[in-house]
């Protein structure tokens, strides 16, 4: 029988009715662990929602150390280890969630900024990863391909060594795969989110859904051009972007989001064949939108971020 432990799951992302990928992953990890342990989900962002089988709340710099000192296990993601260097000496078991390869992500996030800013952003990411790799007791990732990436990183940092190898030649006890997963309950539509609700989209129109945010590493422009070509054969085709404004106010609008709107306007598609939902859809209401779609689409550029990322929103299409 598993003994109950006090577990902290820590994120920097906003915990609210509307959540992005990192917050959703932290929320679902906390929910899964809450079935057998005393779990507190902490965020340094805003928190306006309750947990489900666990406590969800905001924390701050002054309170965080005391929270960690009272925990048996800390599961963390994002830029935390380098900021709170005392975590290196913590007696808690530190589990580092590496599902977001943010050092590769930074190459795209900062792509259109001056070179010194880009180099500084990458250096900050690598400093954080170095702190995480030096201290983590267990590392999580979201796919076998990601695991290959991180084994290389761990090996270069000396974490794949005679001790860790002899303890487990598969290295699964050092780094393991925790996929994002699918909801165990079937989606149910309470009310229509798109068809017959959005002005310009009728109840019988075929809908193409872009189910996540619009970031620099995505290629919505190709999809919009395809809609432009398709409309002559399918005049009632509609494309719907599920959320343009990130729920975390610290995440700025990216250049690709601006270019997407501009192209749609230039082709005369906006409000006729292409529609933008400005605000993020509430997490619990996403089925209302997904079940109104006939096609789910995502497009990416052929670069290293695409190769090693894990597109959390696409699982909802299934």
Task: Locate the predicted segments by residue.
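Conserved donor-binding/catalytic core segment of Leloir-type glycosyltransferases
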Residues: 8-11, 140, 182-186, 193-218, ...
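Acceptor-binding helix/loop patch of EC 2.4 sugar-transfer enzymes
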Residues: 12, 16, 96-127, 147-153, ...
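Nucleotide-sugar-dependent
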Residues: 20-21, 218, 279-288, 294-318
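Short acidic alpha-helix that forms the nucleotide-activated donor recognition element
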Residues: 65-69, 134, 257, 281-294
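Nucleotide-activated donor-binding/catalytic signature segment of Leloir-type glycosyltransferases, i.e.
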Residues: 243-246, 252-288
């Amino acid at each position: 029988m598993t003994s109950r432990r006090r577990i902290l799951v820590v994120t920097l992302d906003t915990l609210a009715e509307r959540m992005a990928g990192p917050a959703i992953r932290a929320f679902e990890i906390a929910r899964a662990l809450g079935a057998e342990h005393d779990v507190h989900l902490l965020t340094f962002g805003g928190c306006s929602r309750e947990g489900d089988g666990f406590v969800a709340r905001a924390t701050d710099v002054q309170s965080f150390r005391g929270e960690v000192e009272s925990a048996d296990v800390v599961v963390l993601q994002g830029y935390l280890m380098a900021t709170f260097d005392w975590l290196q000496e913590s007696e808690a078991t530190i589990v580092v969630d590496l599902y977001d390869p943010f050092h590769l992500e930074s190459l795209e996030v900062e792509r259109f900024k001056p070179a010194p800013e880009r180099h500084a952003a990458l250096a900050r990411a690598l400093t954080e990863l170095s702190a995480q790799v030096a201290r983590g007791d267990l590392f999580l990732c979201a796919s076998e391909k990601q695991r290959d990436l991180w084994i290389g990183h761990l090996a270069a940092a000396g974490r794949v060594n005679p001790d860790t190898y002899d303890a487990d030649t598969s290295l699964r006890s050092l780094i393991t795969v925790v996929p994002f997963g699918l909801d165990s309950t079937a989606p149910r539509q309470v009310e229509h989110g798109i068809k017959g609700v959005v002005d310009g989209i009728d109840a019988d129109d075929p809908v193409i859904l872009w189910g996540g945010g619009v970031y620099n590493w995505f290629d919505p422009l190709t999809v919009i051009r395809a809609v432009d070509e398709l409309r002559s054969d399918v005049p009632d085709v509609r494309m719907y972007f599920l959320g343009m404004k990130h729920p975390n106010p610290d995440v700025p609008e990216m250049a690709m989001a601006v270019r997407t709107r501009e192209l749609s306007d230039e082709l005369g598609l906006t409000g006729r064949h292409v529609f933008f939902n400005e605000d993020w859809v509430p997490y619990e209401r996403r089925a209302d939108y997904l079940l109104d779609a006939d096609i789910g689409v995502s497009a990416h550029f052929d670069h290293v971020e695409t190769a090693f990322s894990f597109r959390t929103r696409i699982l909802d299409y299934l």
